[in-house]
Amino acid sequence: MLKIKLTERADSEILVVGLGLIGKKLQIESTGAQIDTAALLTTLTNMGASGEVDEVIKLPSKSNKLIVFTGLGKIESNFSPELLRRAAGAAARHLLGNDSASFALPHKSVAEIAAIAEGAALGSYAFTEFRGSSKGAQKNPLSSITVVTRFANTAQAKTAMKRAEIIAEQTFLVRDLINTPPSSLTPDSFCLRTKKLASKC
């Protein structure tokens, strides 16, 4: 089961931060992350990074195993929850094969960190039940997500993270059912599965 944690400082070898644009100039947007912004911006510029929404770039780092830059597009004074949800989800989808990551995206409210958590969680889905059994064919999604925020010790933030876990768990269930071929998800097996789920309620 996917776990979502809160922290005031990044505690994972993989760090996810935002990358956006002010005019035509790239800018890194993050919270509670200790990174060499100037050097990273030089590298990103030389690589031809755009900072556009849905762009994801992964770079090795001295302080982290990996820094993941997820596009935020044009930088505004406030980022909408939907944009943050989308950015977190895009990054998570590029992290198959890794166990955990810290998401240090910019935010100003609990509603925004809730969106980050939901996006990261929903992006951490992979249906592998009927895939090949070799290691190369089995790339598991993130099993642990940490959201870096100054709201880490607040009750509202903790409630929002629990809600994000529940949303992800139930969404994954529906996706699994949709992705299971009819030859495996017969009416009888579906009934047994729903009874098992109902017994947990």
Task: Please annotate each region the language model reported.
Residues 1-201:
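Short amphipathic alpha-helical segment within the helicase RecA-like ATPase core
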